[in-house]
Curated annotation (Swiss-Prot):
The atypical FHA domain contains a 'wing' insert and mediates binding to threonine-phosphorylated IRAK1. Widely expressed both in embryos and adult. Weakly or not expressed in spleen and thymus. Interacts with TRAF6, IRAK4 and MAP3K7. Interacts with IRAK1. Interacts with BCL10; this interaction is impaired by SOCS3. Disulfide bonds: none annotated. It comes from Mus musculus. This is E3 ubiquitin-protein ligase pellino homolog 2. The keyword Transferase applies. Pathway: Protein modification; protein ubiquitination. Residues 15-202 form the FHA domain.
Length: 419
């Protein structure tokens, strides 16, 4: 449907318009095996050379599968709602010159602009794949206005290679009071808009489900329940800076150009790393100098790497003594304050899109040890992210590890002039 070349059009003497960016939670700047093509941890949506949007047009009531197939194979985009073996509603879509459409899903077929797979928590290698993915092959579509302010709306389900969306007999679907059909996908597309935007003062919003036609509903009892939630008429499917999109297996963060303009850059995070290292923090026991490893070497524990006791926040170098538990190999007693708890290496959070401010990296998530600014750590510590088909819990945005402890994060205590 779209060639890869259309992703980033290059008009002569003119910078392409970037609508927004999507960042996949659980990756610290790149996929474990590297970003490749339409599979990456961060995806920019650019204005297309030619409008790619579609809008609803003709509605057909058909009584045979053959008639339904005939309409669906005309070359137009269409959504088929199978009500029974003898009744299907087919909604044809026509070209919309005022919008661009981008599709997200697990499929690697050409209609998908941004390929996402199940996020493995803890930053494990992608080879430790889930045996059966819960992400839909054609999960959702995002439609952006081609004119300012480039409003973006999200819809459940994406068009396949035949330009069709099929909602079978068992799918949740219904006819609205105004007569138009709508439905939900099997595991649903959930969206959460933070209160107050994506800033230092933001608070978590309420998770909602988005329908195929873009209406907003309260959550079903479980992800795949037949009964839809209640329509929330006061809310819309318009995405805003900091909106979270959950596809049941991967969660995406929506960032606007203005939001990213005020966010730290990769260079800023690297400068903060160098600033901490220049202060020469020391292990209070071994008195050896500690240093955060280069951003390019964020998978390998290095000799000078800082480690921390996550129950108290004291930062040390690595040592093998202090075990206080036969069952928990990671439980150690801090030599500074005698507090017992997890003892882990510290990793700098490198994905700038997850920061709500440009503050210094002073706090670590527990139990993974990813470090970022205080306000960013506290923001993510209070966000309930969908887990599985009916659970929610806070998780580290850099590795998707479920957070634990009283605050889900801890203030780090460095020995020396850093603190």
């Amino acid at each position: 449907m779209f060639s890869p070349g259309q992703e980033e059009p290059s008009a002569p003497n003119k910078e392409p318009v970037k609508y927004r960016e999507l960042v996949v939670l659980g990756y610290n700047g790149a996929l474990p095996n590297g970003d490749r093509g339409r599979r990456k941890s961060r995806f920019a949506l650019y204005k297309r050379t030619y409008a790619s949007g579609v809008k609803p047009s003709t509605i057909h009531m058909v009584s045979t599968p053959q008639a339904s197939k005939a309409i669906s194979s005309r070359g137009h985009h269409s959504i088929s709602y199978t009500l029974s073996r003898s009744q299907t509603v087919v909604v044809e879509y026509t070209h919309d010159k005022d919008t661009d459409m981008f599709q997200v899903g697990r499929s690697t077929e050409s209609p998908i602009d941004f390929v996402v797979t199940d996020t493995v928590s803890g930053g494990q290698n992608e080879d430790a794949q889930i045996t059966q993915s819960t992400i839909s092959r054609f999960a959702c579509r995002i439609v952006c206005d081609r004119n300012e302010p480039y409003t973006a709306r999200i819809f459940a389900a994406g068009f396949d290679s035949s330009k069709n969306i099929f909602l079978g007999e068992k799918a949740a679907k219904w006819k609205n009071p105004d007569g138009h059909m709508d439905g939900l996908t099997t595991n649903g597309v959930l969206v959460m808009h933070p209160q107050g935007g994506f800033t230092e003062e933001s608070q978590p919003g309420v998770w909602r489900e988005i329908s195929v036609c873009g209406d907003v509903y309260t959550l079903r009892e479980t992800r795949s329940a037949q009964q839809r939630g209640k329509l929330v008429e006061s809310e819309t499917n318009v995405l805003q800076d900091g909106s979270l999109i959950d596809l049941c297996g991967a969660t995406l963060l929506w960032r606007t150009a203005d939001g990213l303009f005020h966010a730290p850059t990769q260079k800023h995070i690297e400068a903060l790393r160098q600033e901490i290292n220049a202060a020469r923090p020391q292990c209070p026991v071994g008195l050896n100098t500690l240093a955060f490893p280069s951003i390019n070497r964020k998978e390998v524990v290095e000799e000078k790497q800082p480690w921390a006791y996550l129950s108290c926040g004291h930062v040390h170098g690595y040592h093998s003594w202090g075990h206080r538990s036969d069952t928990e190999a990671n439980e150690r007693e801090c030599p500074m304050c005698r507090t017992v708890g997890p003892y882990v290496p510290l990793w700098l959070g490198c994905e700038a899109g997850f920061y709500v401010d440009a503050g210094p990296p002073t706090h670590a998530f527990t139990p993974c040890g990813h470090v970022c600014s205080e306000k960013s750590a506290k923001y993510w510590s209070q966000i309930p992210l969908p887990h599985g088909t009916h659970a929610f819990h806070a998780a580290c945005p850099f590795c998707a590890t479920q957070l634990v402890g009283e605050q889900n994060c801890i203030k780090l205590i460095f020995q020396g002039p850093v603190d």
